[in-house]
From Swiss-Prot:
<dbReference type="GO" id="GO:0003924">
    <property type="term" value="F:GTPase activity"/>
</dbReference>
<comment type="similarity">
    <text>Belongs to the SIMIBI class G3E GTPase family. UreG subfamily.</text>
</comment>
<dbReference type="InterPro" id="IPR004400">
    <property type="entry name" value="UreG"/>
</dbReference>
<dbReference type="GO" id="GO:0016151">
    <property type="term" value="F:nickel cation binding"/>
</dbReference>
<comment type="function">
    <text>Facilitates the functional incorporation of the urease nickel metallocenter. This process requires GTP hydrolysis, probably effectuated by UreG.</text>
</comment>
<dbReference type="GO" id="GO:0043419">
    <property type="term" value="P:urea catabolic process"/>
</dbReference>
<dbReference type="InterPro" id="IPR003495">
    <property type="entry name" value="CobW/HypB/UreG_nucleotide-bd"/>
</dbReference>
<dbReference type="GO" id="GO:0005525">
    <property type="term" value="F:GTP binding"/>
</dbReference>
<keyword id="KW-0547">Nucleotide-binding</keyword>
<keyword id="KW-0342">GTP-binding</keyword>
<comment type="subunit">
    <text>Homodimer. UreD, UreF and UreG form a complex that acts as a GTP-hydrolysis-dependent molecular chaperone, activating the urease apoprotein by helping to assemble the nickel containing metallocenter of UreC. The UreE protein probably delivers the nickel.</text>
</comment>
<dbReference type="GO" id="GO:0005737">
    <property type="term" value="C:cytoplasm"/>
</dbReference>
<dbReference type="InterPro" id="IPR027417">
    <property type="entry name" value="P-loop_NTPase"/>
</dbReference>
<keyword id="KW-0143">Chaperone</keyword>
<protein>
    <recommendedName>
        <fullName>Urease accessory protein UreG</fullName>
    </recommendedName>
</protein>
<keyword id="KW-0963">Cytoplasm</keyword>
<feature type="binding site">
    <location>
        <begin position="11"/>
        <end position="18"/>
    </location>
    <ligand>
        <name>GTP</name>
    </ligand>
</feature>
């Protein structure tokens, strides 16, 4: 098995994908060799955000402009992303982890197995507590489901208990977690999930 792990990060617009990647990079970059590919339709805003936040060195972040449906670029024709990932892997030969962040998409989004090894799907509480029971591949089949922005639950009238109940029903025994990127709550759970997936796990503490 190769030493690097390709991790797809998907979810609707505004769910907090980039913020979670930022947190993970900041927490893990001293222990793991990391790179990121971001997807936007017409800009490279997510790549710029990660660069400006100093989550990683600029040369480890590559922005891809898909120019169309974000789902197509990660599933039906993922060549533009595959090339970007391979360029980073060629440039940094000791990579442990490559994040591929999709453009904001709907609940039907999923990554091609040719592009990533595992998929983390992110939804947020602000979209309402009905989201988990709506289903879709991201909810039911992702390797890890993240329910982000739990700090907004009271503000938007969402019940975390309902979201937990429906998530357990939809995902059976598949892992999931609540997160708050402002406080860092739940981020360690994602790190632990990655720890169990990365061959170079000895670098984790």
């Amino acid at each position: 098995m190769e030493s690097k792990l390709r991790v797809g990060i998907a979810g609707p617009v505004g769910s907090g994908k980039t913020a979670i990647i930022q947190r993970l990079c900041e927490n893990l970059k001293d222990r793991l060799e990391i790179a990121v590919v971001t997807n936007d339709i017409y800009t490279q805003e997510d790549a710029k955000f990660l660069t400006n936040s100093k989550a990683l060195a600029p040369e480890r972040i590559k922005g891809v402009e898909t120019g169309g449906c974000p789902h197509t670029a990660i599933r039906e024709d993922c060549s533009i992303n595959r090339i970007a990932v391979e360029e980073l892997e060629h440039k940094f030969t000791t990579l442990d982890l490559v994040f591929v962040e999709s453009g904001g998409d709907n609940l039907a989004a999923s990554f091609s197995p040719e592009l990533v090894d595992v998929c983390i799907y992110i939804i947020d509480v602000a979209a309402g507590d009905k989201i988990p029971r709506k289903g879709g591949p991201g909810i039911t089949r992702s390797d890890l489901l993240v329910i982000n922005k739990i700090d907004l639950a009271e503000m938007v009238g969402a019940s975390l208990k309902i979201m937990e109940r429906d998530t357990l029903l939809m995902r059976k025994n598949l892992p999931w977690c609540f997160t708050n990127t402002k406080t860092g709550e739940g981020i360690k759970i994602i790190e632990g999930f990655l720890c169990n997936q990365i061959p170079s796990v000895h670098k984790m503490v």
